[in-house]
Amino acid sequence: TQESRPTLTGVNFIFNNSSIKAVPTDSHRLSQRQISLENGPQTSTDLIIPGKSLVELSRIIGESDPEITVNPGENQVLFEVGNIAFYSRLLDGQYPDTDRLIPTESTTSVEFELPVLARSLERASLLTHESRNNVVKMTLDVQNQLVKLQGDSPEIGNVEEEIGFKNLEGEGLTISFNPDYLREALRASITDSIIMNFTQPLRPFTVIPAKQDVNFPQLITHVRTF
């Protein structure tokens, strides 16, 4: 849990001379955003910054896209944004090795337009939020080129609908997951289309941008339903 592993309340930033990578995880899901960096440090720098501090920093920045200077110290970090200086403490500890968790290959892949998937997910999860088990089931029928999303509530009933998609390939698959995790991944996405990559029904899956030049994989764990 985050209480027993304080580092999971923070975001791991890895700086080098040409890029910056930010990785948050709560052990049920993770995301990894990497962008190119100008004037990076000559030696690799690894920081764990509290999530609450980053929320406050984002409020200061707002919708603008300013130049930010990051000055790490021994126990704290200084962000300089224009004439504003923002200090945050750093978290002690070792962040999990998340690189090994993200699959490099997949057996099933489906591409969606983000708004289409988001609307279907919203409808399917209306029922699941009424039950104790907040789980939806996605069925990928490659042979018949169908994708279905199903939500159930023992007290109310179930909803099932087909989802429109742009491309579906690989092996047929049925997987269950927490719809809130996928919803938040879609909200964080920065492209109009996303690709979901799967390996096995009982393994985590990834949500990635449908653009080659955007490095932003998000990993979501499955939910066992038996």
Which residue stretches match the model-derived regions?
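Bateman (tandem CBS) regulatory domains
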Residues: 101-105
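DNA polymerase processivity clamps
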Residues: 1-34, 40-91, 106-226
